[in-house]
């Protein structure tokens, strides 16, 4: 079993970004809170929106930073330091260009794949990359020069449905991760592919 104490959903703040692909991590955390009859509330000392859940018998904090994506580490480090949470007790949910919509994958540690949110979190955690990541597939525009516009764009309804289905399965697999550990959660989540 994995002892995750903090689950973070990455996003850009403000209504104009709420429905953009880059905010997929926050969609997951918001839905996770909602499923447990909680809602995130602004907590300025953590530079973000927070909630507290009992998940699989474990006390877990949720966080969606209110900073821009490339400054996400400020909120994560503030909360981790206050509650004495180690990098390996953190799960960060984020949008992933290298995975198709309708799929999501879990991993521990590794690179940041050019994701500015992950980059800043690793930086602010003392350059420690050993935190869990939930990589929510958004697909790739096919051309590197189009990436910024793509992640800051809204997915069409057909893709949104696929992303939502993958987030739904990710929430079920979060309980598996907490109860039965990383291998079981990965095996289940990585076998999932939403169909249109």
From Swiss-Prot:
Q: Report if keyword Hydrolase is assigned.
A: yes
Instruction: Report the EC code(s) recorded for this entry.
Output: 3.1.1.29
What does this protein do, in the record's words? Hydrolyzes ribosome-free peptidyl-tRNAs (with 1 or more amino acids incorporated), which drop off the ribosome during protein synthesis, or as a result of ribosome stalling.
One annotated GO molecular function: tRNA binding
**What biological process terms from GO does the record include?**
protein quality control for misfolded or incompletely synthesized proteins; rescue of stalled ribosome
Q: What is this protein called?
A: Peptidyl-tRNA hydrolase
Return the InterPro entries for the record. Answer: Pept_tRNA_hydro, Pept_tRNA_hydro_CS, Pept_tRNA_hydro_sf
């Amino acid at each position: 079993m994995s002892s995750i104490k903090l689950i973070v959903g990455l996003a850009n703040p403000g209504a104009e970004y709420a429905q953009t692909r880059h905010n997929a991590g926050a969609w997951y955390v918001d839905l996770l809170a909602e499923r447990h009859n909680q809602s995130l509330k602004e907590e300025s000392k953590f530079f973000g929106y927070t909630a507290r859940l009992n998940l699989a018998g474990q006390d877990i904090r949720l966080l969606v930073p209110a900073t821009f994506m490339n400054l996400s580490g400020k909120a994560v480090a503030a909360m981790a330091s206050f509650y004495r949470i180690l990098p390996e007790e953190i799960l960060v949910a984020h949008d992933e260009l290298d995975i198709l919509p309708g799929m999501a994958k879990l991993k521990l540690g590794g690179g940041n794949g050019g994701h500015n949110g992950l980059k800043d979190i690793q930086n602010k955690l003392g350059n420690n990359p050993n935190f869990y990541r939930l990589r929510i597939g958004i697909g790739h525009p096919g051309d590197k020069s189009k990436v910024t516009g793509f992640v800051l764009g809204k997915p069409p309804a057909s893709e949104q449905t696929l992303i939502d289905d993958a987030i739904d399965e990710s929430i079920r697999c979060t309980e598996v991760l907490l109860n039965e550990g990383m291998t079981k959660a990965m095996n289940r989540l990585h076998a999932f592919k939403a169909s249109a």
